[in-house]
Curated annotation (Swiss-Prot):
Source organism per UniProt: Scylla paramamosain
Source superkingdom: Eukaryota
This protein's name: Scyreptin
Keywords assigned by UniProt, alphabetized: Antibiotic, Antimicrobial, Fungicide, Immunity, Innate immunity
């Protein structure tokens, strides 16, 4: 499985100890998947759900390459980290 984030993002992920945040729809209209869009008050690409920014997983990040599998991420859904 190829990485869904650039190398610079991967190194930034390694600097954090735990919180991984993403945009998740508050409704079930997107089958519970992480929503496409960005956090921080920007308009998400999809208007089918009300998006909120929240931490979806806490784990040690010694191996950031495991994140896509652990989070079940889809292309275009990665957004930002919470320090």
């Amino acid at each position: 499985m190829r990485a869904l984030y650039p190398e610079s993002f991967k190194s930034k992920v390694a600097m954090y100890s735990g919180a991984w945040c993403g945009c998740r729809p508050r409704t079930r209209q997107l089958s519970g998947r992480l929503g496409r869009g960005t956090c921080g008050g920007r308009q998400p690409a999809s208007r089918s759900a009300d998006f909120s920014c929240e931490c979806v997983l806490l784990l040690p990040l010694q191996d950031p390459s495991l994140l896509p599998q652990k989070l079940g991420l889809f292309a275009g859904t990665l957004v930002r980290l919470s320090p």
